[in-house]
């Protein structure tokens, strides 16, 4: 059986896929503990692969989260991925109290009811929530970005005095 080492596959991915997709693949490898960041840092990546390495995070729980992280980097605000808030992980905490949640296909039925209960608890405690889904992130990003920018423009990310 012929098998290429993961490091070689990641290098090829970096050179063959657009940046967002390459970062999502690398993030997934880190998240699944198929490789660790110190090992990646020691490898002689160059060109676009070194750019991908500079953008990876082991905290991305899905490819959607990788895309969103890269798309929000320009904001220059404190953005905490996979933050713990009131005993639950949220996809992103922007500033002090704006929460961005990204729903995948698993957010239906019982999961949706649990999500709604947690959203209610977050709102009671003064957090603002933006919840978006796969289709919005992948096919209508400008509308998602506009929601986030409007919320920030209204100061919804800032701690209330």
Where are these regions (language model features)?
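Surface segments flanking catalytic/ligand-binding clefts of nucleic-acid enzymes
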Residues: 30-161
